[in-house]
Amino acid sequence: MKRKNVWAAIALTMMAAVVAGCSKEVSNPDNNTEELHQEIIVNPVELPTSLELTRAELEMVKSSNEFAFNLFRTAQDEKESQILSPISITFALGMLNNGAAGETQQQINKVLGFADGGAEGINDFCYKMLEMAPTLDPLTKVMIANTIYMNEPYELMPDFILKANAFYHAESETRDFFDGETRDVINKWAADHTEQMIKEVLKEDEFNPLSVSYLLNAIYFKGNWAKKFDKAETRDEHFVNVLLEDETEVAMLTPQPMMHQRDKFDYCDTDDYQALRLPYGNGSFVMTVLLPKTDSRAVPKVPTAEVWEQLNQRMHSTLVDVKLPRFESDTDINLVPVMRKLGMVDAFSPYTADFSRFCVWSKARIYIDLMKQVAKIKLDEEGTEAAAVTVIGMKDGSAGVDGYPLFHANHPFLYVISEQKTGAVFFIGQFTGR
């Protein structure tokens, strides 16, 4: 029996609009990390911030959106609701990409949509977002943070540290991963930078004390609707799902708290979608909801970046009767198979990965062993709160699968007993299991 949820992709598309749509961004000339994370005082008469983008920067936004929709199309779950932050992945991978070289770096560039701009283009894009997104709307709270935890005795390349600090405002901390506290420290960092929405990004069985490092990005968004829903208007109504049993579609009606209002909104109608844009605060951030027309019960087809651009161009203000579920959704996803399908292959193998610009230890074969994201969204009559943390765990392939050489004598072998200083052989033998 296969269950389809119409909101599975819609919730993700919302996050793409909220987060990937943050192509407007924070000014922090003193590079003060604390200042980046302070909530800005509300000013009810503040007008939308004007963001002037060069042609190159507009191309960066387009490239980022291309990755966003490709990512969700590849990761889309046909049964469950889902929430992802493409831009959080871009931050985490973009930071790490400064330690990559050769084909590994080229694959990362291409997957993120920066085949032409390269690592420098990703750095510029992320810096622009980091600097500007938090200050676009004083009515909306946006926080972006990056960090790196290194395991002793590994050291980061000086040039990597320089770029991580300059473009991502990332600080690195070296710890003994066997101290029994590092996982808690990482999870606390995630919680602190998402207003406690993401309290555990690394589960106990996911944290490896033999890892070389963990790179993290956290993004947090909280915005009140410019036109709030009246709670008195919220009613439980039927929500249509489809059950597939023996190749037969059976409609299942489930009650959902449905918010309601009638007002003027940006809206467009195409052959494939009804699209509605709901603004937050002063209008600098919006949520765009895509409702499929061909089959209102099916998981929506994820649009391309080009279709997304066309939808935005066709939007027009009109009176709309809106019903939208009040809901919460969270996702904990392993990104390794997703990124492989998108074309980022070499980075996940100690035999093909080239992170020679990441770690000082020349003999190390650094590769990505873990890449995941935890994301959450809450949507109600007041507005939306959403957060995501992306973590990338690096391993040393030259030290064996678990950080040390593997010597499993599980087939015939020779043995020698000798005097240590001279090497004089006292006994020599073999063991064949018989």
Model-predicted regions and their roles:
Residues 1-3:
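N-terminal secretory signal peptides that target proteins for export/translocation
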Residues 5-7, 11-14, 20-177:
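Detector for small/aliphatic-rich hydrophobic stretches
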Residues 79, 119-293, 313-400:
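Non-catalytic, conformational "gating/processing" segments within enzyme and secreted inhibitor domains
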Residues 86-100, 213, 415-421, 425:
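Extended, hydrophobic/aromatic-rich amphipathic alpha-helical segments that build helical scaffolds
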Residues 102-108, 297-299, 331-333, 387, ...:
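Extracytoplasmic/secreted cell-surface and envelope-processing proteins
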Residues 215, 274-290, 400-434:
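Extended hydrophobic
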Residues 292-316:
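Internal alpha/beta scaffold segment
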